[in-house]
Amino acid sequence: MTRIKRGYIARRRRTKIRLFASSFRGAHSRLTRTMTQQRIRALVSAHRDRGRRKRDFRRLWITRINAVIQEMEVFNSYNRFIHNLYKKQLLLNRKILAQIALLNRSCLYTISNEIIK
């Protein structure tokens, strides 16, 4: 009985995984089983951290806005500032407000004065 060579499908799957794991260190980029395990773990971490990144940036923006507001002493808290912002129907999101707070504090001061009026 002649020897039958295996097909290319499994090899193609492994090379695809190997390309994904080529930047990993040690056995994680060399051994097939650990490569597949690390690939799954990397994808799980990426999926989890996409949601976490959104939360982290929102927290950073809120912290920056709060710091500048308390320094200006127009409002004594962040939540009063945001509440009055919504009451006056000034639609500025936290990302834009944080950029204004960092780059142009006088503009944020005029915004807060508009809210008070």
Swiss-Prot record:
Gene3D superfamilies: 6.10.160.10, Ribosomal protein L20. One of its GO terms (molecular function) is structural constituent of ribosome. It is found in: Plastid, Chloroplast. It comes from the Eukaryota. Belongs to the bacterial ribosomal protein bL20 family. Binds directly to 23S ribosomal RNA and is necessary for the in vitro assembly process of the 50S ribosomal subunit. It is not involved in the protein synthesizing functions of that subunit. This is Large ribosomal subunit protein bL20c. It comes from Aethionema cordifolium (Lebanon stonecress).
